[in-house]
Amino acid sequence: MQLGDMSAMLKQVQQMSEKMQEAQKQLESMTAIGESGGGLVKAMANGKHEIISIQIDKDVLDDVDMLQDLIVAAVNQALTEATKMAQEEMSKVTGGMMGDMNFLKNLNMGG
């Protein structure tokens, strides 16, 4: 590989790194919502897989066991949606170069 080729490749890597950092910042402001019990419990996550809010309808406050199950289901759905959102956003940056890697599922976007 010639020096010019190596320089061009390094420049491309740097540009991709900058684009990925920008995409990660965008993910912080994106939200995904999960709900359970027909909307009785709603959880909101950002693109960094952080739960940022939980809303609970007062009608389920009397049944703690059901409430716990509904919270878990809503949070899991919100995190699944956040993962899909992150994968789509990063795919835009990489142009599909990374294929169908599932590394984002376990990626701690928080640093």
Curated annotation (Swiss-Prot):
UniProt xrefs under Pfam families: YbaB_DNA_bd
Cell compartment(s), UniProt: Cytoplasm, Nucleoid
Recorded GO CC terms: bacterial nucleoid; cytosol
GO molecular function: DNA binding
Record has DNA-binding as a keyword: yes
Alphabetical keyword list: Cytoplasm, DNA-binding
Gene3D superfamilies documented for this protein: Nucleoid-associated protein YbaB-like domain
Main location: cytoplasm
Keyword NADP: no
Subunit structure: Homodimer.
Function: Binds to DNA and alters its conformation. May be involved in regulation of gene expression, nucleoid organization and DNA protection.
Similarity-based family: Belongs to the YbaB/EbfC family.
HAMAP family linked to this entry: DNA_YbaB_EbfC (MF_00274)
Record-given protein name: Nucleoid-associated protein Ctha_1157
Native species: Chloroherpeton thalassium (strain ATCC 35110 / GB-78)
Lineage: Bacteria, Pseudomonadati, Chlorobiota, Chlorobiia, Chlorobiales
